[in-house]
Amino acid sequence: MTTLTRIIVTSIISMLMFSCNFSMQLGEGVSGNGNVIKDERPIQNNFDKIKVSQGLDVHITQSSTPSLTVEADENLMDLIMTDIEDGTLKIYSSENIRRATSKKVLVNVESIASIKATSGSDVLSKNTIAVDQLELQTTSGADINLDVKTNHLDCNATSGSDITLSGETTTLNASATSGSDINAQHLKAETSNVKATSGADISVNTSKALTAKATSGGDIRYSGNPEKIDKTDTSAGSVRQE
């Protein structure tokens, strides 16, 4: 995108996110007491999807032995909820947490199909997540950082959120909008289908085929010397090789 467009888009997004974060800090909420404890919680039902929100941190480990452990300030422990409904592990807080020494949830899971992170939450993998298909969604300033090995990977980032990927996949489908970033330059893909709009950025590493569309100040960068390229850039969008 042009320098002027990038400045305008970045400024608007920064002001919106600052306003949101400022409001959250001034609003009512509970602060941690600094005494961090662990709580290993029972897993009552099977799940292969994870949804996390409200600024909590989730560390995922692929393991044949499922487990669920919360590490948090003692007075915040009962506020951090971990419910399993219809195959989805929902991780959230029952009240606003203003400050915490720790608000971490450690999840060991054998297989995972979907991860959704919202409202400033952070999700990262502690080892390589090896599955056939995986769907990732981020919004409202949330972050996902994963190392993966998949055949089919779908990513969607909106509203100033970020997805960072490494590893390998056969097919990558990625969409980013509203100032979000998808950094997949360390993810080796054979085929990539990507779309960036409204000031979003996507970087990919693809070897065989790339279909890329950038509009409204979106920016797509690619590496890997794909054999086939189909690219479209309009309305100050940009598709370029790194």
Q: Could you say what each language-model-derived stretch is?
A:
Residues 1-158, 162-177, 181-242:
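Intrinsically disordered, low-complexity terminal regions
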